[in-house]
């Protein structure tokens, strides 16, 4: 995951769930937290989050709380995706609506994810 603000990569992270034995160590959460720390604010409303996989419910909750400007993701996640696949957490459920673009280089992202998790598990 990468957080970009003003055309500059502010932070980047990858999934550390297995490495840390921590279910909350998703790439999105780690990248958002690092960006907030670097910028000195919990409001990232001028930043865009780029991720390989459509964010899950936990990550979408954090994305909304950080007030990220938009999410761009590669592969749709029909099992747990909460931008559009399983539910749209930021659409009408709160006063925070996060625009998203999905399916960017989807096959390439899906292949990256398959290889990553094959090596981790």
Where are these regions (language model features)?
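Short secondary-structure boundary/capping segments
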Residues: 1, 40-41, 90-92
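A short, polar/charged loop-to-alpha-helix boundary motif
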Residues: 16-30, 34
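Short beta-strand scaffold segments in enzyme catalytic cores
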Residues: 1-7
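Conserved hydrophobic residues forming the short capping helix/wall of the S-adenosyl-L-methionine
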Residues: 35-39
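Immediate flanking context of iron-sulfur cluster ligation sites
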Residues: 41-53
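Residues embedded in well-ordered beta-strands within globular domains across many folds
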Residues: 2, 48-50, 72
